[in-house]
From Swiss-Prot:
Keyword vocabulary terms for this entry: Activator, DNA-binding, Transcription, Transcription regulation
Keyword Transcription: yes
Domain of life: Bacteria
Entries under Pfam families matching the protein: cNMP_binding (PF00027), HTH_Crp_2 (PF13545)
SMART domains attached to this UniProt entry: cNMP, HTH_CRP
Positions of the HTH crp-type domain: 142-215
Residues annotated to bind a nucleoside 3',5'-cyclic phosphate: 6-128
InterPro entries (UniProt xref): cNMP-bd_dom, cNMP-bd_dom_sf, Env_Response_Regulators, HTH_CRP, RmlC-like_jellyroll, Tscrpt_reg_HTH_Crp-type_CS, Tscrpt_reg_NtcA, WH-like_DNA-bd_sf
Gene behind this protein: ntcA
UniProt keyword Methyltransferase present: no
NCBIfam families: NtcA_cyano
Protein name: Global nitrogen regulator
Source organism of this protein record: Synechococcus elongatus (strain ATCC 33912 / PCC 7942 / FACHB-805)
Matches recorded under PROSITE patterns: CNMP_BINDING_3, HTH_CRP_1, HTH_CRP_2
PANTHER family: CRP FAMILY TRANSCRIPTIONAL REGULATORY PROTEIN, REGULATORY PROTEIN CYSR HOMOLOG
Amino acid sequence: MLANENSLLTMFRELGSGKLPLQIEQFERGKTIFFPGDPAERVYLLVKGAVKLSRVYESGEEITVALLRENSVFGVLSLLTGQRSDRFYHAVAFTPVQLFSVPIEFMQKALIERPELANVMLQGLSSRILQTEMMIETLAHRDMGSRLVSFLLILCRDFGIPSPDGITIDLKLSHQAIAEAIGSTRVTVTRLLGDLRESKLIAIHKKRITVFNPVALSQQFS
């Protein structure tokens, strides 16, 4: 966990112990946290798990723009614009999650009273913008093998834990969940993961993926 993430979680806990009405919410995997068009009434801090943010288009196509890790803040568009607005993204629990949520008007006051909170939040948002750019680049690949590899490398960066064999992605990932994230099908993802296992680039144990050598994996479809 990064220092600024520690600070952010600590600040939210401190705010919750004061006058700020901090609410704890839990969602099972696949449950919607908010839909596009919902009124933006609360700001969220992800305490445990992972949340998928996606953009839904009129055609029905849904594109993943970010996969948020623990200690990420989201639902903050109104804070950035200074105006009340509706939700822009579809937020879904990618794994079972626990959230802190705060009414947006109270969060606005807290940012004025504690400027350091704004600075820490800005650092977190900068990291998310980088991940969104990487996700867009991932989805630009027409080849599903390249798309899957790019996605696994993003997960190594944001959810990876060093292990004796390489980098273990600290998420339980079903083939269906991966397929939904990269715009593929479960059958295709199962086949591609099988190919990577046969090539001894990854291992899968209890739905957790270990990448033996991220550099070698990145060269798989280059």
